Amino acid sequence: MKEIATEYSFIKYTELELDDNGSIKQLSIPNKYNVIYAIAINDELVYIGKTKNLRKRINYYRTAINRKDKTSDSTKSALIHSALKEGSKVEFYARQCFNLSMTNELGTMTIATIDLEEPLFIKLFNPPWNIQHKKK
């Protein structure tokens, strides 16, 4: 993951840890907005996603394992919890995205790079948890 982070401008955001009760500790770090994020387990990239609010997304992964209605996020939550309980290192990386605005005689158009970058990184790295993008 370190090579990917260096080459593609991902910065380490946080490393998750378990508390004494076996729950993921609450984050107490500044938030990141409009980012592509990567989850790495023992320095291996396992997932690429996008979010408008990274701390909120990670907090959702912290608690989604306990929700009655299962989603793809609860699946990732269970995988993250399992990795931590096995003693693996779970880290989140972030790459800042921007909105590009172009103006011509017809007006202004804005494109969010987050929507362009996420599928490109998924295709480039083919992370195992990105099953929605796997070829059928």
UniProtKB/Swiss-Prot annotation:
Annotated ranges, domain GIY-YIG: 32-131
Transmembrane segments: none
Outcome of swapping residue 49 to A: Nearly abolishes endonuclease activity
SUPFAM superfamilies on file: GIY-YIG endonuclease (SSF82771)
Enzyme Commission designation: 3.1.21.8
GO MF entries: DNA binding; endonuclease activity; metal ion binding
InterPro entries xrefs: EndoII-like_GIY-YIG (IPR044556), GIY-YIG_endonuc (IPR000305), GIY-YIG_endonuc_sf (IPR035901), Host_DNA_Degrad_Endo (IPR053748), Phage_T4_DenA_endoDNaseII (IPR016413)
Domain of life per record: Viruses
Cofactor(s) demanded: Mg(2+)
Enzyme kind, highest EC tier: hydrolase
Keywords: Bacterial host gene expression shutoff by virus, Degradation of host chromosome by virus, DNA-binding, Endonuclease, Host gene expression shutoff by virus, Host-virus interaction, Hydrolase, Magnesium, Metal-binding, Nuclease
Gene3D superfamilies membership: 3.40.1440.40
Pfam families in alphabetical order: GIY-YIG (PF01541)
Protein role: Contributes to the degradation of host DNA, permitting the scavenging of host-derived nucleotides for phage DNA synthesis. Sequence-specific endonuclease. Catalyzes nicking of the bottom strand of double-stranded DNA between the first and second base pair to the right of a top-strand CCGC motif. Does not cleave native phage DNA, which contains 5-hydroxymethylcytosine instead of cytosine.
Quaternary structure, from the entry: Homotetramer.
Protein name, per record: Endonuclease II
Species of provenance: Enterobacteria phage T4 (Bacteriophage T4)
Gene: denA
